[in-house]
Amino acid sequence: MKKLFATFLLLTISSLAFAQKKTVQVEAGITYPIGLKKNGNKENHIGFYANGIYNFTNSPLSAKLRLSYDSYTVVMNEYSNSPFNGRSLVILPSVNYNFPTSSKVEFYAGVGAGVSIDNMDRGVFNNGKKCHAVCAPQLGVNIINHINISAQYNITQKDFSRLMLGIGYIF
């Protein structure tokens, strides 16, 4: 009985220690664009991302470095609102303010500024690629310290701005 109690106590303490927020974390996940214009969802596809996260100690702030590949619809007005497939590689450092509501749920809001390498129909680095500055306000929630659900609006060159919804796993 003592061994069973000691094992239970050890597992409980170790799970509590593991649940504490780590200083450095890595997140991987998928994104999906939401079109905000007419015909804005015809060429949307699932993308993926990786985040490096640094949680400042004794502070509600965290810093992220995001690398993402997105495939989404570009509606260009000069071509009678015809939808095209846009592809982007985004490098986005950001700062978030975390609102811990409980040990299981934490909301956050933040903003990032970085670079978006954009192209249409041919992949990212083929002929026609363009580099644009990107600013991205973001909202999200971390659930059970490992699941991240987020919304991010990438504000960039007129035809390439987009709303991205994401879900990821924090390691």
Predicted regions and their residues:
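Cleavable N-terminal export/targeting peptides
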Residues: 1-25
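Residue-level preference for beta-strand/loop junctions
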Residues: 5, 44-46, 87-89, 105, ...
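Short N-terminal segments immediately surrounding and downstream of signal-peptide cleavage
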Residues: 21-37
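Outer-membrane beta-barrel "beta-signal"
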Residues: 25-27, 160-171
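Gram-negative (and chloroplast) outer-membrane scaffold detector with strong preference
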Residues: 34, 46-122, 143, 147, ...
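Solvent-exposed loop/turn segments connecting transmembrane beta-strands
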Residues: 36-44, 129-131, 153-165
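An anionic, turn-rich surface loop/hairpin at beta-sheet edges
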Residues: 124-138
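Conserved active-site loop/cleft motifs that coordinate metal ions or position small ligands
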Residues: 147-153
